[in-house]
Design a protein with these regions (language model features):
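Aromatic-lined glycan-binding groove of carbohydrate-active enzymes
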Residues: 197-235, 268
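N-terminal binding-site loop/beta-alpha segment at the start of enzyme catalytic domains
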Residues: 1-85, 151
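Generic structural signal for well-ordered alpha-helices
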Residues: 45, 68, 72-75, 113-117, ...
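Structural preference for beta-strand elements that scaffold enzyme active sites
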Residues: 13-17, 54-55, 84-88, 124-127, ...
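Terminal-tail/helix-coil boundary detector
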Residues: 1-2, 42, 231-264, 279-283, ...
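Glycine/proline-rich, positively charged
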Residues: 27-28, 33, 94-196, 200
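Conserved, mostly hydrophobic/aromatic
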Residues: 6, 18, 41, 56, ...
Length: 344
């Protein structure tokens, strides 16, 4: 297992992060994702820790708090030293019926941070992330609330999730202008089956020194090796929960190339998908969730896969985004003086 800086911070995290969205679901949306209870969660966490994973991600909304509770108990059950793990959680989603029981207002953030700490049985959160953009709350209010948590010692680092490029850059600018605790990470959807992030968000992250944590790297299981143009196995998650949306024809093209690469390297299709992400400069960590230990073990094997330039070119040929304005115009006009930068 290798460790990478989270953005431009001094925090180093494992290149794979254990996702816990499969913890604690019942007969609702979360149950379609996973219903792991304590003993199963303990087993997954132990497997992750034994492999060198030090980064674990959850959210207050996952199974309406149950995921955090199970993770907290798992850390205790395994006797994990606090300094050995980086615990990330998120706030934004609805945790009650009222209008103030959701979103990114100061009150909701401060209340939910304390609630998450209680469920996790911790005295601080290593990375606290705003789970989505709240159009009803000024960005300044959100960032001031996060800064308060850092100054109180309840939170160490701050991140965002599912924000647009302009929102991220604006937030970074506000923290700099007001001398607030900085934004060090973005958690976002990025995969060979969906590279939309590359248009605006990836350049913004590289420009501002914000690290990328990837969620759903296998496109909701579509790149798990269970799917092809001939159909799917009955255990595929998308049979009951078809999310995130993808262009399936393009994804099938990618799967065909991935199968060839996997056959040549003696690895699996999901390992190729994860390895491709680990070859992307913007990525700090890739979040991998699982329902079984063998799935997690297979994902961990991706850290040993080296893709050649030929492999990367073949994958790019079937998954790259079509050119759109203003991207193609920026590239064209940038050529006027690009050679001057190359000569330095």
């Amino acid at each position: 297992m290798h460790y990478r800086r989270l953005g431009h911070s001094g925090l180093f995290v494992s290149e794979l992060c254990l996702g816990t969205m499969t913890f604690g679901g019942s007969d609702d949306m979360w149950g379609h994702i996973g219903k792991l209870q304590q003993e199963e969660a303990d087993g997954l966490l132990k497997t992750a820790l034994d492999a060198g994973i030090n980064f674990i991600d959850t959210a207050n909304i996952y199974a309406t708090g149950k995921s955090e509770e199970i993770l907290g108990h798992a850390l205790k059950n395994l006797g994990v030293p606090r300094e050995d793990v980086v615990i990330a959680t998120k706030v934004h989603g609805p945790m009650g019926e009222g209008p103030n029981a959701r979103g990114s207002s100061r009150g909701h953030i401060l209340d939910q941070a304390k609630a998450s700490l209680k469920r996790l049985q911790l005295d601080h959160i290593d990375l606290y992330q705003i789970h989505g953009f709240d159009p009803a709350t000024p960005i300044e209010e959100t960032l001031e609330a996060l800064d308060t948590l850092v100054r109180q010692g309840l939170v160490r680092y701050l991140g965002l999730s599912n924000w647009a490029a302009w929102q991220i850059v604006k937030a970074v600018g506000i923290t700099q202008a007001r001398h607030l605790a900085p934004i060090v990470s973005l958690q976002a959807y990025y995969t060979l089956a969906g590279r939309d992030l590359e248009r605006e968000v990836v350049p913004a992250l590289l420009s501002e020194g914000v690290g990328l944590m990837v969620w759903s790297p296998l496109a909701g299981g579509f790149l798990s090796g269970k799917y092809d143009r001939e159909g799917t196995t009955a255990e595929g998650r998308r049979v009951t929960f078809d999310f995130p949306p993808i262009d399936k024809d393009r994804a099938y093209d990618a799967i065909e190339v991935m199968r060839n690469i996997a056959a040549e390297k003696g690895c699996t299709v999901p390992q190729v998908a994860l390895a491709w992400l680990l070859h992307q400069r913007v990525v700090s960590s890739v979040i991998v969730g699982a329902k079984r230990v063998d799935q997690l073990t297979d994902n961990i094997g991706a850290t040993e896969i080296q893709l050649s330039e030929e492999d990367l070119t073949a994958l790019d040929a079937v998954t790259k985004l079509p050119e759109e304005y203003p991207g193609w115009m920026i590239e064209r006009q940038g050529e006027y003086r690009a050679h001057l930068m190359q000569e330095r």
